[in-house]
Amino acid sequence: MPLTDLGIDEARTYRPNVPEPDGFDSFWAETLDEYSGVPQDLTAVPFDNRQALIDTWDLSWAGYHNSRVSGWLHAPAAVNGPLPLVIEYLGYSSSRGVPIGSVFAAAGYAHIVVDPRGQGWGHPTLTENCPDVHDGSGAPGFMTQSLSDPHGHYYRRLFTDAFRCLQAAREMELVDPTRIAVLGHSQGGGQAIAVCALAAMRGIKLAGAFVDVPFLCHIRRSCDIATDGPYDWKSFVTWLPTRHCAAVLSRLSGISTACISPVGPELLPGFQSR
């Protein structure tokens, strides 16, 4: 039986102590070093979205292990830029969906919607979903893949894809690299936090981060209160011998955005369309 969540007053002051695992910073530094100097190999193919005021491109770039990652790029029609950019990361089970209804492009921004690898069953799309060739086994879902080797964990792959999207976007003629913000809800919020931190580790300044109910921030507590997916590690630890639970949670903390977030972006003024 899960615990009841906190009351509103407790929630406002809740500041969990999430221990950072040994080697956390070096793990992510090594992840970035692995792709240092590797071209993003960005392609942008015009896509007919049947809209008069917004142009759309089918994006693709080299993500984790140079596997292709996809997304939509939307921008005001017939505008050359450079434009401020919003990169949107999506929630668990999402796909980049259909290329219509970008409120950011309608407001004068460039807007990238990133397809999360291996997901997409929760939303319709006009294109094939970005595949994921995973490196290890685990319980159903993504949280427990390759627990024996964090280098093969799904969220290491996903965060790498997300950060390389930022790197690729900064090189686009359409985009003003000094005015890029990241946006995400739930799993997308976790990605946005991770990208902020990884950007800071590489000296990249972001204009802002818009994060809503981010996923992966306090994994131990989610095991206490969750009743359903995407918290698939809950079913995993249910049958796991008790003596192994602490080790599993310690390894999962290697992808905790609560640990990575304190080194997030130096926010800059001036994120406005023009």
Q: Residue locations for each model-derived region?
A:
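A short loop-to-beta-strand scaffold at the N-terminal edge of the catalytic core in hydrolase folds
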Residues: 55-77
